[in-house]
């Protein structure tokens, strides 16, 4: 039973690459043909690469490690959040803050601040503070929630993999992961550099359906890996 079918990939438009003038020659092995000025991705390779990434992510989670989903472009934000939550993992879908991995200690102080503000809202502290101050604190909480809400429970030292939508956009995240020796799994379009990625999934990173389909398979791998870990206990 294959992880993903050609039919699913076709229906989601995973095969549509970028315009031929906006390409990275290193992606040539993953290109099937060119049609109307657009590169068409070889979906047989995508099927194989999804399977490789799936097995890798599954083994990472079965070893008790965590996975971070990263996709801050509009087309990816919703799928990144929903699929990471469905699989009980972590996500960044608004903005990658410098040092999110390499300087997690500093980021952790911001997370603590967010948790403190949440507690203040819950225990009624906001109700007894001056209105002006509450507005200021609520705005701060909202901003922190947007940027850090998805990594509140992340243990950066236990990160086994990072999943990326659009390596060009998420270059800072990739650099930090590389710096720490964390393997990178990514949806790589025809305009990206595959050399930076440990597990390349050639595919359209601009269509919401394409992004959701592949992201959901990564989440499935996590869920299956977790079941394996539970069985081993």
Swiss-Prot record:
Alphabetic keyword roster: Ribonucleoprotein, Ribosomal protein
An annotated GO BP: translation
Encoding gene, per UniProt annotation: rpsB
Record-linked PANTHER family: 30S RIBOSOMAL PROTEIN S2 PROKARYOTIC AND ORGANELLAR, SMALL RIBOSOMAL SUBUNIT PROTEIN US2M
Gene3D superfamilies: Glucose-6-phosphate isomerase like protein, domain 1, Helix hairpin bin
Domain of life (superkingdom): Bacteria
Protein name stated in the entry: Small ribosomal subunit protein uS2
GO molecular function: structural constituent of ribosome
InterPro entries for this protein: Ribosomal_uS2 (IPR001865), Ribosomal_uS2_bac/mit/plastid (IPR005706), Ribosomal_uS2_CS (IPR018130), Ribosomal_uS2_flav_dom_sf (IPR023591)
Any one annotated GO CC term: cytosolic small ribosomal subunit
CDD domains: RPS2
Family matches, as Pfam families: Ribosomal_S2
Family to which the UniProt record says this protein belongs: Belongs to the universal ribosomal protein uS2 family.
Taxonomic placement: Bacteria, Bacillati, Bacillota, Clostridia, Eubacteriales
